Regions:
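The feature captures the conserved acid-bearing segment of alpha/beta-hydrolase catalytic domains
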Residues: 166-254
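C-terminal catalytic histidine-bearing segment of alpha/beta-hydrolase fold enzymes
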Residues: 226, 243-289
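A domain-start/cap signature at the N-terminus of enzymes
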Residues: 16-56, 66-69, 80-83, 109-111, ...
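Conserved acidic catalytic loop of the alpha/beta-hydrolase fold
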Residues: 122-139
């Protein structure tokens, strides 16, 4: 009987996920489901009245798993751009800790996991499915993440095909620097050989991306702050880590003669706060506008 509760939870989860019918999302706030079975992902949606040809903002939550909040915090931005918001929910039960933000590629002891459990291709499926349902797979879209969501995106761009007009990574706790002498999560060491080549780094640095930093994000402790020795090699605080990540990557691109399509935007007087970062006026510059 000790397996009864997880089993019941799983059944309820699948029922909940299958309750939304696929197709064009309704106007206003809503929820849809993408994928089937244990790959089903709940997506919180907002669509302004009369939405037709506008872009889609895919919002990636952090460790608090508050995708609904990210949807709500993005409504003003969506209205301004006559854009749709889609915020996928990567639940704690299936995507514990780094199984979400680091892609779930490796186990804790560094062994390769089954690709079916990786969070990166699941996100790609969400993006492609939503675009297709809304009638245009080539519609302009943006990937925006804060904290753990930014960790997710800065790693995602090296692993998955990216068709977004721009990726915006705000206040990530750590980054995967494009180097092999640091293990995965902080660098690309210990990954399968297919991800340990310069082609991956080139792809990563050529992807249009904004490293979006709150200048007051300088705390050295907190519930979800990585204070490990590996993390501190990147910098002592999130602001410093973001700056170092950008500068290291920029220098590598220059050294290799690659295109460097990143920008860095800093927001004064804002710390580790997704709502404030999303609704600051500088988000326009971060989006490339």
């Amino acid at each position: 009987m000790r397996f009864a509760l997880p089993f019941v939870f799983g059944i309820l989860h699948l029922v909940q996920m299958s309750s939304a019918s696929p197709g064009v999302a309704p106007e206003g706030k809503g929820e849809v489901s993408v994928g089937e079975g244990d790959r089903a992902i709940q997506v919180f949606i907002y669509k302004p009245k009369g939405f037709s040809k506008g872009p889609i903002f895919f919002m990636f939550h952090g460790a608090k798993r508050n995708a609904e909040d990210y949807r709500n915090w993005s409504i003003a931005l969506a209205e301004k751009h006559h854009a749709m918001v889609a915020a996928p929910f990567f639940d704690q039960e299936r995507f514990l800790a780094h199984l979400y933000s680091w892609g779930g590629i490796l186990t804790k002891d560094g062994k390769l996991r089954d690709r079916k459990g990786w969070s990166f291709p699941i996100a790609t499926e969400v993006i492609q499915t939503i675009l297709k349902r809304e009638g245009n797979p080539k519609r302009d879209h943006y990937l925006i993440g804060h904290s753990g969501g930014a960790q997710f995106l800065t790693r995602y761009v090296a692993i998955e095909p990216v068709t977004a007009k721009r990726v915006v990574a705000a206040n990530a706790g750590t980054y995967a620097f494009p180097r092999l002498d640091w293990d995965w999560g902080y660098g690309f060491g210990k990954l399968p050989s297919e991800f340990q080549n310069e082609g991956r780094f080139k792809k990563m640095l050529e992807t249009p991306m904004t490293v979006y930093l709150g200048m007051a994000d300088t705390l050295t402790e907190g519930e979800n702050f990585d204070a490990s020795a590996d993390a501190n090699l990147e910098g002592k605080v999130r602001l410093e880590r973001g700056r170092n990540f950008f500068e290291y990557s920029q220098k590598l691109a220059k050294q290799k003669g690659w295109k460097f399509n990143w920008t860095k935007v800093e927001v004064p007087n804002v710390g580790h706060d997704a709502n404030l970062m999303i609704n600051d006026l500088r988000i326009e510059k971060a989006l490339g506008n």
